[in-house]
């Protein structure tokens, strides 16, 4: 430990103790909050089913930075490199298109065996796994509909894909001893004025009920459903809207997924957490950064990321909220994107844990909003960075921007050879 870092740490302990915060306890609590990293940042959501195929479903990964992962071995190596630079507990979030098989596998035929390499890797790296059916980038999703499709056979194909995905998810949880959160997001919607908005939602309701009809052990698998405002090519109507999925999660008691980019630009999911928690058992968060639309930019340590973290900590939602990331930027080094976004999420959680929340609640209850605002602002200047650096040091990860040197070295030695 460097003398400078240790001195800063000792001073930070004193400063936070003066406002009633035990920094050692904050670090212990931070280790209770794993962040689920999304595999698809590493290859621009290409997957291994048809890596040369185009990305569909109203989403885009823009940019052509060299060195993207081309297969599972490269993707796992890249993830390991990123994870070495991120302190504290982590999980990995997989999509169905990241299966591994020597032969072509239809999506409604995926099985746990197609993900056994991921499970063995997760065991070796002490990671939990989360999962997602992939209802996009497929010939049977080309017309913009999947689980709400009017064609019975196509709709059944996607139902069977989601049912098969649930079994894969349960396999993850059973093998790794920690439940896998499986999130269902579909791109279903229409580009222009839609006359019948009801029928697709009726079909989606029935389809989802069939998907979750098989009883699985909640210690192994958790169902989540995710809404969206619009996507490219589905600007006028989205079947799985916020109201639809809020109603579904409430009535079926599934988890509800809130994605930071899936609402109107003036809406924030930090304000939705406390409302949704009154009605659903668990929440899944997709922390992202929408720039004018659901652009999935790399997560910053900005006001909304901080507000999301603060909601989790202030209301002690550690056991009811699952924190995941969802961004994919192909214009910068993809490993750096993972590191920047995940470290920022963890920084936000730490800052929330270092907040004098008890005192702030007292001021709010007393109607002293002047002192509340003053204290909220002044605590931003407390030396949280020194606490973060100690956390990095204890987890044998680089302090400050030192991690960038490792990324550059890996880029030169490994990524540059990929063409």
Curated annotation (Swiss-Prot):
Pfam family of the protein (one): RhaA
Co-factor: note: Binds 1 Mn(2+) ion per subunit.
Broad enzyme group: isomerase
Source organism superkingdom: Bacteria
Gene3D superfamilies for this protein: Divalent-metal-dependent TIM barrel enzymes (3.20.20.150)
Annotated catalysed reactions: L-rhamnopyranose = L-rhamnulose
Binding of Mn(2+), residues: 262, 294, 296
Sorted UniProt keywords: Cytoplasm, Isomerase, Manganese, Metal-binding, Rhamnose metabolism
Pathway(s) served: Carbohydrate degradation; L-rhamnose degradation; glycerone phosphate from L-rhamnose: step 1/3
Official protein name in the record: L-rhamnose isomerase
Phylogenetic classification of the source organism: Bacteria, Pseudomonadati, Pseudomonadota, Gammaproteobacteria, Enterobacterales
């Amino acid at each position: 430990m460097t003398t400078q870092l240790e001195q800063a740490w000792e001073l930070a302990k004193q400063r936070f103790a003066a406002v009633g915060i035990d920094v050692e306890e904050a670090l212990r609590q931070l280790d209770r909050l794993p962040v689920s990293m999304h595999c698809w940042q590493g290859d621009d959501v290409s997957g291994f089913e048809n890596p040369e195929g185009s990305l569909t479903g109203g989403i885009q990964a823009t940019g052509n930075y060299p060195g993207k992962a081309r297969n599972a071995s490269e993707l796992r190596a890249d993830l390991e490199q990123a994870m070495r630079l991120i302190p504290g507990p982590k999980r990995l979030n997989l999509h169905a298109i990241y299966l591994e098989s020597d032969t072509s596998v239809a999506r409604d035929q995926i099985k746990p065996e197609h993900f056994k390499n991921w499970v063995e890797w997760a065991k070796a790296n002490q990671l939990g796994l989360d999962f997602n059916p992939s209802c996009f980038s497929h010939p049977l999703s080309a017309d913009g509909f999947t689980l709400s499709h009017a064609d019975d056979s196509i709709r059944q194909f996607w139902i069977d894909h989601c049912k098969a995905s649930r079994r894969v998810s349960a396999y993850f949880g059973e093998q790794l001893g920690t439940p896998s959160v499986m999130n269902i997001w579909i791109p279903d919607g229409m580009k222009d004025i839609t006359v019948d908005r009801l029928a697709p939602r009726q079909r989606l309701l029935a389809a989802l009920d069939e998907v979750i009809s098989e009883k699985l052990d909640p210690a192994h698998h958790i169902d989540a459903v995710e809404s969206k405002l619009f996507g490219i090519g589905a600007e006028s109507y989205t079947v799985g809207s916020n109201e639809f999925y809020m109603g579904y999660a409430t009535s079926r008691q599934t988890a509800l997924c809130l994605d930071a980019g899936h609402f109107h630009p003036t809406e924030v999911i930090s304000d939705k957490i406390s409302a949704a928690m009154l009605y659903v058992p668990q929440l899944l968060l997709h922390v992202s950064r929408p720039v004018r639309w659901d652009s999935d930019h790399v997560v910053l340590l900005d006001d909304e990321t901080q507000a999301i973290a603060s909601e989790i900590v202030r209301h002690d939602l550690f056991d009811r909220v699952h924190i995941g990331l969802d961004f994919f930027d192909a214009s910068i080094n993809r490993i750096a994107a993972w590191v920047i976004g995940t470290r920022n999420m963890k920084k936000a959680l730490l800052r929330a844990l270092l907040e004098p929340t008890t005192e702030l609640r007292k001021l709010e209850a007393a109607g002293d909003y002047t002192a509340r605002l003053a204290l909220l602002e002044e605590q931003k200047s407390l030396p949280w960075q020194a606490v973060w650096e100690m956390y990095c040091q204890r987890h044998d990860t680089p302090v400050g921007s030192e991690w960038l040197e490792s990324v550059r070295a890996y880029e030169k030695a490994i990524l540059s050879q990929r063409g």
